Amino acid sequence: MPHPSDEIKLLIESNSADVLRLRRRIRETFALRDKSPSKLQEWRRACEIFHSRYDELAFPGGYHGALDRLVAGDPYTMEAAICFLEIRPYFFRSGYMFDAMLRKAKRAPLNPEQRARLQIVVDEFKAWKAAKQLKKVSEGSV
């Protein structure tokens, strides 16, 4: 039987792919924007579309206000935040979102299952940071 969060995770992954696609379109049109007025317009339109859709794609229910909703205990936002942290999507500004969401999730009124899932994320993140630091030390860059 699928977990209730599976649908949210699929949405996050799909939205992440859309953000990457829209961002790629900006880069493609940027390279040609000085070639003609129509190319400039294509680039402007790509930017406009990206910025108009980013908030809704970045996080289920919209990223604007999501951290406040998380700490306030909104059930959907709490589940979506845990899902986001578990899959750690990669797109424009997602790393900053991950850090902010992780900090806020620690203070959110999560249920016991969500709290356990968050602890796994925290433990994996600490291990990743330790491995990253160890690599820096072994390369002599610290």
Task: Describe these PLM feature segments.
Residues 1-142:
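Extended repeat-based scaffolds of very large eukaryotic assembly and lipid-transport proteins
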